[in-house]
Structures are given as structure tokens and as C-alpha cells.
From Swiss-Prot:
Cellular component terms (Gene Ontology): mitochondrial inner membrane; respiratory chain complex III
Keyword Heme among record annotations: yes
Protein name (database record): Cytochrome b
Gene transcribed to yield this protein: mt-cyb
Transmembrane parts of this sequence: 33-53, 77-98, 113-133, 178-198, 226-246, 288-308, 320-340, 347-367
Length: 380
């Protein structure tokens, strides 16, 4: 008699994904981030749900309702701090997950990779509309500046901006719809995540060697279920430590001031996890050019599989491309730093050089290095 987990129509699906899934025996801790992202999403949905029970999406009460949550609601301060810092951990895991994919050539699973890029965009949109909700100064001005970028779209730009705003400026209609979007998007993210997994399980996981691992598989449970559990403990420990000891470390002090359309903050900048893209946007003096560069800074990930020139899958045995990969990591850190700096010398030129290098690495240098390594292998 086969066990219930192998016969029940619903439990069978979970079993094939979480229990009897054949996984490569050599996948390292870098393969933990997928499950960590799932944990982040669940944490954000749960804390967000409890916050939504007490939040009011009206410009006259939004800021006060957040203060009320932190002061008067049972453990409201904790729920809010976990939700706000959970977003940062979400993006840390996202960037590490993408970096793993780039390093080990996981992007060659094209459907899985492209759905992942769509997920990345969806999570970015969710985080952006969520940042507007507390209705502080940086919430308001961040929303104004970023939505205003759509006015760069030829012909329909201005109409598009007014359509998103629901008026002629960021106002009550904007806040209400952003709350609706912020509530909806995580569930769309959850649905697309299932698609992401569906396509991944068509091929099975990649591994650090970049070789076919069909001959050497082990079951997901207990080996990787416990390994994932360890990752959960480490991440939750980090998240609770940040949320309890320095919850405002990654936030902007401007957001402690209620939104005021008449006073512009000295430096308008998004949360730290968007700064690299913001730096690329600012480094182009033309509005439409900046918007296109911003968009392409994310969409460039979609062309990575097309530009794969190497005979080998990962970078494990490719020192030249390894060097360029770590150059890309350093470049991202520089862009993040520049995004938080004022627009003045020398930050402008550093940002422009870093932006050019960012695209050059993806589109020219890494594919070229792969081709050169192929040539070098022919001489061995």
C-alpha cells in the first residue's frame, strides 16, 4: 500500500517538491536562498496582513495610523519593525540568489531564469508602493520623483503620470491605490513563485560543478529540508536582531516627518536596495535616457543566457570570468554608495564610470572573457 503522500492528489504535489525531490548531492549553501526567499515572502505577507488590519490609507490619518500601530497595538512595534526590515532581508537574499545564478550558470535554465527576473521586477514594484504607505517625507517625495519618470515616455507620458496619480499630484487617490497594489502584489509574487518552481523542477537544480548530476542525486528530505531549516534559523536570527536592536538603521530619518508637499527634503533617495539602479538613472543627463537605463539595468539579466559564450557552465574553473564577476559585485557596491550621495563632483563622474562598467561587463566583457577562455582551452 503506497503512502498517502504519494497518492493524494494535493499532498502528492507537495511531496514531489519538498520530500521525494531528487536533488544534486553537492549543492552548497548558495542553493539555500530560494527557500529563504520563500520564507521572506511568507513573513512579509503575514506581518503585512496584521499591519493592514490597523493601517488607514488616507493622507490625513496614514502617518498617525503607523504611529498608532507602534504605540498602541499589541506588539505592533515588533510587527512593523519585522515588516520594514524584512524587506531589506528579502532584497539581500534576492541579490545573493541572482549572484549565485550568474556565478554558476543557472541562467541556462532560460524559462526559470526569465520568470525569476519577472519576480525580481514584481518584488521591486511591491517594495516601492509599500514605501509610500507610511506617508512620511521620503515616502511622498520618493513617490513623486519615481512616478514622475513616466512623464519621459514620448507622447503619452504626462497622461500616464496623471493616470497613476489619480490627479495632478501625488495625493489621497495615489495613496489609496498604492495600498491596494501593495496588498495585491505579494499574492501575485506567490503565484509566479509557483511557476518559477514548476519550471525549475522540469530540469532539476544546477550544481556547483555545472555538470549533469543525474547519476548522483539524494532526496530533498531529510538532507536539504534540514539544511534549509538551518538557513531559516540564521536568517530569522539576523532579522530579529536587526528589528529589535536597530530597527531604523536602514531607514531614512526624513520619514519621521509627515509628508509635506511644500517642503522638499535636501536629498531625495530610495531605500538602500534600489540605490544601484537610482545611481544608473541619475548618471544619464537626459530624462528618457535615464529611465531607459534604469529599466535596462534590470532587464539586462534577461540577455545573460543569450550572451553565454563559454563551453563551461559555471565560473568554477574560469579565472578570467571570475575576476569580472567580482568586478561586477564591486561595481554594484560602488553604484549603491553613489546612489545615496548628492549630485556633485566627484560623485557624478564616479557614477557615470560605474554605470558604463556595469553594462560593459554584462554585454561585452564577460561574453568576451568566455570566448577567450574557450580559445585558451583549445591550446591546452
Amino acid at each position: 500500500m503506497a503512502s498517502l503522500r504519494k497518492t493524494h492528489p494535493l499532498i502528492k504535489i507537495a511531496n514531489d517538491a519538498l520530500v521525494d525531490l531528487p536533488a544534486p548531492s553537492n549543492i552548497s549553501v548558495w542553493w539555500n536562498f530560494g527557500s529563504l526567499l520563500g520564507l521572506c515572502l511568507i513573513t512579509q505577507i503575514l506581518t503585512g496582513l496584521f499591519l493592514a488590519m490597523h493601517y488607514t490609507s488616507d493622507i490625513s490619518t496614514a502617518f498617525s495610523s503607523v504611529a498608532h500601530i507602534c504605540r498602541d497595538v499589541n506588539y505592533g512595534w515588533l510587527i512593523r519593525n519585522i515588516h520594514a526590515n524584512g524587506a531589506s532581508f528579502f532584497f539581500i537574499c534576492l541579490y545573493l540568489h541572482i549572484a549565485r545564478g550568474l556565478y554558476y550558470g543557472s541562467y541556462l535554465y532560460k524559462e526559470t531564469w526569465n520568470i525569476g527576473v519577472v519576480l525580481f521586477l514584481l518584488v521591486m514594484m511591491t517594495a516601492f508602493v509599500g514605501y509610500v504607505l507610511p506617508w512620511g517625507q521620503m515616502s511622498f517625495w520618493g513617490a513623486t520623483v519615481i512616478t514622475n519618470l513616466l512623464s519621459a515616455v514620448p507622447y503619452v507620458g504626462d497622461m500616464l503620470v496623471q493616470w497613476i496619480w489619480g490627479g495632478f499630484s501625488v495625493d489621497n487617490a495615489t495613496l489609496t491605490r498604492f495600498f491596494a497594489f501593495h496588498f495585491l502584489f505579494p499574492f501575485i509574487v506567490a503565484a509566479v513563485t509557483i511557476l518559477h518552481l514548476l519550471f525549475l523542477h522540469e530540469t532539476g537544480s544546477n550544481n556547483p560543478a555545472g555538470l549533469n548530476s543525474d547519476a548522483d542525486k539524494i532526496s530533498f528530505h531529510p538532507y536539504f529540508s534540514y539544511k534549509d531549516l538551518l538557513g531559516f534559523v540564521v536568517m530569522l536570527l539576523g532579522l530579529t536582531t536587526l528589528a529589535l536592536f536597530s530597527p531604523n538603521l536602514l531607514g531614512d530619518p526624513e520619514n519621521f516627518t509627515p509628508a509635506n508637499p511644500l517642503v522638499t527634503p535636501p536629498h531625495i533617495k530610495p531605500e538602500w536596495y534600489f540605490l544601484f539602479a537610482y545611481a544608473i538613472l541619475r548618471s544619464i543627463p537626459n530624462k528618457l535616457g535615464g529611465v531607459l537605463a534604469l529599466l535596462f539595468s534590470i532587464l539586462v539579466l534577461m540577455v545573460v543566457p543569450v550572451l553565454h559564450t563559454s563551453k563551461q557552465r559555471g565560473l568554477t574553473f574560469r579565472p578570467a570570468t571570475q575576476f569580472l564577476f567580482w568586478t561586477l559585485v564591486a561595481d554594484m557596491i560602488i553604484l549603491t554608495w553613489i546612489g545615496g550621495m548628492p549630485v556633485e563632483h566627484p560623485y557624478i563622474i564616479i557614477g557615470q564610470i560605474a554605470s558604463i562598467l556595469y553594462f560593459a561587463l554584462f554585454l561585452i566583457l564577460i561574453p568576451l572573457a568566455g570566448w577567450l577562455e574557450n580559445k585558451a582551452l583549445e591550446w591546452v
